[in-house]
């Protein structure tokens, strides 16, 4: 009966295709981060729905409603803390997942890679919109500074900024729009994730050696589902430790102050996972140039499949690309540090050097 349902029922067929999925035998724990991203997405959607039930998208009540959730809603402090900190876990997983893809040349699977980069861009946008919603000092000023960057677009810039703001400054209309989009985008991410998985199942998974592994495969369940379960347990231990012991560890102290348009924070900065892109933005003296560099810091991933194909499909077999990859990781971490510092010497000069190095490394990796 069970086998009949798995073969003939549409939902059963989908489940069966996952269970019977042929995976390369030699994939490591780094291939588990895709399933961890799915877990983080489900966690974010569920906690976000509960938070949306109590949040008020109004500039006079948003900050108080966030405090009300933490103080008076049953387990509201837990739901809010899980939502805020699992966003950090989400980005740890997504950066590791992307890094693994670059290292093992997963960009050779073009359709899967393109959808994945689009997912990264929309996830970054969604996280930024969510950062604005508590309507603290850093939320307000981050919204003002980042949206104002669009004014660098020739001819249409100012009109686009006013359209996004819903007026001539960040106001109630802006907050309402950001709230609506922040609620909508996770469902768009879910749809794109399904596309990502469909393309992945069509092309088959990559492996550490970068070789054709069609003759050396194992069923996903129970072997790799058990391996993924270990990653899930470790992720929940990490998330639980932060949520229960240091819930405000990754939250900017300025955001515990209600938004005040008349007082500018000493140093405006986004969440830690945006700091590398923010450092690249600040390193270019010209406004339009900075915006283009910011966009290209992520959009350059779209061009990886079009660059020269490496002799070997995996950086583990290519000493030059292996060194270049770890230089890229180091560069990314240094940019994250620079983004958290004020725009003054020597941080400004280091940021400019690291920005040039960041884009140069991609060029080095693209050459045979």
UniProtKB/Swiss-Prot annotation:
Positions with a binding annotation for a ubiquinone: 201
Binding site for heme b b562: 83, 182
Binding site for heme b b566: 97, 196
Cofactor note: Binds 2 heme b groups non-covalently.
GO molecular function term, any single one: ubiquinol-cytochrome-c reductase activity
Membrane topology of the entry: Multi-pass membrane protein
UniProt signal peptide: none
Keywords tagged on the record: Electron transport, Heme, Iron, Membrane, Metal-binding, Mitochondrion, Mitochondrion inner membrane, Respiratory chain, Transmembrane, Transmembrane helix, Transport, Ubiquinone
Regions that span the bilayer: 33-53, 77-99, 112-132, 178-198, 224-244, 288-308, 323-343, 345-365
Cofactor names: heme b
The keyword GTP-binding is annotated on this UniProt entry: no
Pfam families per the UniProt record, alphabetical: Cytochrom_B_C, Cytochrome_B
Keyword Lipid metabolism among UniProt keywords: no
Principal subcellular localisation of the protein: mitochondrion
GO cellular component, one term: respiratory chain complex III
InterPro entries the UniProt entry points to: Cyt_b/b6_C, Cyt_b/b6_C_sf, Cyt_b/b6_N, Cytb/b6-like_sf, Cytochrome_b, Cytochrome_b_C_euk/bac, Cytochrome_b_N_euk/bac, Di-haem_cyt_TM
GO terms under biological process: mitochondrial electron transport, ubiquinol to cytochrome c
Cystine residue pairs: none
Compartments, record wording: Mitochondrion inner membrane
Purpose of the protein: Component of the ubiquinol-cytochrome c reductase complex (complex III or cytochrome b-c1 complex) that is part of the mitochondrial respiratory chain. The b-c1 complex mediates electron transfer from ubiquinol to cytochrome c. Contributes to the generation of a proton gradient across the mitochondrial membrane that is then used for ATP synthesis.
Family of the protein in this entry: Belongs to the cytochrome b family.
Subunit structure: The main subunits of complex b-c1 are: cytochrome b, cytochrome c1 and the Rieske protein.
Protein name: Cytochrome b
């Amino acid at each position: 009966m069970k086998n009949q349902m798995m073969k003939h029922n549409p939902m059963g067929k989908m489940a069966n295709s996952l269970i019977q999925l042929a995976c390369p035998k030699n994939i490591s724990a780094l291939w588990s981060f895709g399933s961890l991203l799915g877990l983080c997405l489900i966690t974010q959607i569920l906690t976000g729905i509960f938070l949306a039930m109590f949040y008020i998208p109004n500039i006079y009540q948003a900050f108080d409603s966030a405090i009300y959730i933490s103080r008076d809603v049953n387990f509201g402090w837990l739901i809010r803390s899980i939502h805020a900190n699992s966003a950090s876990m989400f980005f740890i997983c997504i950066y590791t997942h992307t890094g693994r893809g670059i290292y093992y040349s997963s960009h050779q699977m073009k359709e899967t890679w393109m959808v994945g980069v689009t997912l990264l861009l929309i996830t970054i946008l969604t996280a930024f919109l969510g950062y604005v919603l508590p309507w603290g000092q850093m939320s307000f000023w981050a919204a003002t500074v980042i949206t104002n960057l669009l004014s660098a677009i020739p001819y249409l810039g100012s009109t686009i900024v006013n359209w996004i703001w819903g007026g001539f400054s960040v106001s109630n209309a802006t907050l309402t729009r950001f709230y609506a989009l922040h609620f909508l985008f996770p469902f768009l991410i879910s749809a794109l994730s399904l596309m990502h998985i469909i393309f992945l199942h069509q092309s088959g998974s990559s492996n550490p050696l970068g070789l054709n592994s069609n003759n050396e495969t194992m069923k996903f369940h129970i072997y790799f589902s058990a391996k993924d379960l270990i990653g899930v347990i470790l992720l929940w231990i990490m998330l639980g430790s932060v949520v229960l012991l240091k819930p405000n560890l990754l939250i900017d102290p300025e955001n515990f102050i209600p938004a005040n348009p008349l007082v500018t924070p000493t140093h405006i900065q986004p969440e830690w996972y945006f700091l590398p892109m923010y450092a690249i933005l600040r390193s270019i003296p010209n406004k339009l140039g900075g915006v283009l560099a910011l966009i290209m810091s992520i959009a350059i991933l779209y061009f990886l499949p079009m660059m020269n194909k490496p002799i070997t499909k995996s950086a583990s077999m290519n000493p030059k690309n292996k060194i270049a990859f770890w230089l890229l990781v180091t560069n990314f971490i240094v940019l994250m540090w620079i983004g958290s510092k004020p725009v003054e010497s020597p941080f400004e000069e280091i940021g400019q050097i690291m920005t040039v190095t960041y884009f140069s490394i991609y060029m080095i990796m693209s050459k045979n």
